[in-house]
Amino acid sequence: FVTSHQAHFIRTTPTMPEYEPVALSKRAGEDALRERIPGLAEQGIDFVVVSGDMIEGTITATLLERANPGAIADRRESAGKLYNVSEFAAEVALAAVEPIPSDNTRLVGDVSSFG
């Protein structure tokens, strides 16, 4: 399951008002899928959440930038680096073949400003 840090951490870290409805919806999806982990495991199915920061080059980042000029630059400065689509896609692909973390979560990019 691919999500954003802004959605994954929505309960502990506020996000931009423009993104909050999306973040809450994505978190609800993540929670619903996490509830199924025991049943999936019984069937031999692995599950991992891949959470990434704002991804440069996506329509979501572009729309957030239009609604909140400077959002991408501000997040890049705070995180030190933002992944582009190809870089994040490579991380998602790795999540499919590498061992599943014990908490079923692969965090891609800086999370120091999320709690």
Model-derived segments and their meaning:
Residues 43-53, 64-115:
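C-terminal helical subdomain
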Residues 1-42, 54-58, 64-67:
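Catalytic loop of short-chain dehydrogenase/reductase
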